[in-house]
Amino acid sequence: MAKVGYILKADHYDGFNDDIKWMEQYGCCRIVQESSDLEKLRPQWKQLMDCLERGDELVISKFSNALRGSRELAFFLEFCRVKVIRVISINDRIDSKGVLFPETTVLDVLNIFGALPEEAAALRKASAHVEKLKTVVNT
């Protein structure tokens, strides 16, 4: 039963180092750091999903950082249910076991999941804007 972390390196996200530190202190044996220029394909995320085994724990920075919308969320939750994977989202303050963030309510979770498509789209838009600016500056 491994503890594994995943974070997408978004250019505009200031909490990246804090999240990595949290994952390390929690005891993650591996922390996957996906580059934002690979956001569309996310090969490391896909590889991580293939490697997770029954009873593992997955620590993510935030659901909108790891998932891109409601359809992916539904697949992800079913995948974790079937494989009995504990999911911990640091900034959403969600622990599927209910141990780490007992103050998080059902309403909080519903609001987080309801806002997921909008937050994921904003993340992609900001990353695309930064990439566009890098291209313009380099030409």
Listing of model-derived features with the role each one plays in the protein:
Residues 8-15, 35-46, 61-74, 93-98:
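Acidic, metal-coordinating catalytic cores used for nucleic-acid/nucleotide bond scission
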Residues 4, 23-35:
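Short beta-strand elements in bilobed, periplasmic/extracellular small-molecule ligand-binding domains
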Residues 47-51:
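Short amphipathic alpha-helix with an adjacent loop that forms part of the alpha/beta core around
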